[in-house]
């Protein structure tokens, strides 16, 4: 999963022509690690229609603050440079897929 930073967030996420799912997490966060396979599967199933990236909240303070990320994991789908869906806490692959489906079907 590609990592983004405060410095690259605008180019990698906000300027993307396809939706981008951002996992706000941290290396010490076990639930963050637990959801990564589900997010990777969603990205693989929707290849070319979505990207999944992660942002380390310990190393990048500005972006989580901008989007009111108060706990990890927080997963936000951005489309057209705007946050469209937010899920806080760990969820099942099916919950992520259901929530993000309207943005991945074209």
PLM region spans:
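A short beta-strand-turn-helix
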Residues: 2-20, 61
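Hydrophobic beta-strand anchors of alpha/beta hydrolase catalytic cores
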Residues: 21-22, 52, 75
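Conserved Rossmann-like nucleotide-binding pocket used by diverse enzymes
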Residues: 5, 25, 51-53
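Typically the conserved alpha-helix immediately C-terminal to a functionally engaged Cys/Sec
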Residues: 31-46
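Non-catalytic, surface beta->alpha helical segment in thiol-disulfide oxidoreductase systems
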Residues: 71, 76-106
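Short pre-active-site segment immediately N-terminal to redox-active cysteine/selenocysteine motifs
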Residues: 17-18, 24-28, 71
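The canonical Cys-X-X-Cys-His
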Residues: 29-32, 75
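Structural microenvironment flanking redox-active thiols in thiol-disulfide oxidoreductases
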Residues: 57-63
């Amino acid at each position: 999963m590609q990592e983004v930073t405060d410095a690259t967030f605008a180019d990698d996420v906000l300027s993307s022509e396809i939706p981008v799912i951002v996992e706000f997490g941290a290396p010490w966060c076990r639930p963050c690690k637990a959801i990564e396979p589900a997010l990777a599967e969603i990205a693989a199933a929707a290849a070319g229609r979505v990207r999944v990236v992660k942002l380390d909240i310990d190393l990048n303070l500005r972006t989580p603050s901008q989007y009111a990320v108060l706990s990890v994991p927080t997963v936000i789908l951005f489309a057209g440079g705007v946050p469209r869906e937010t899920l806080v806490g760990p969820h099942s692959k099916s919950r992520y897929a259901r929530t993000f489906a309207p943005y991945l079907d074209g």
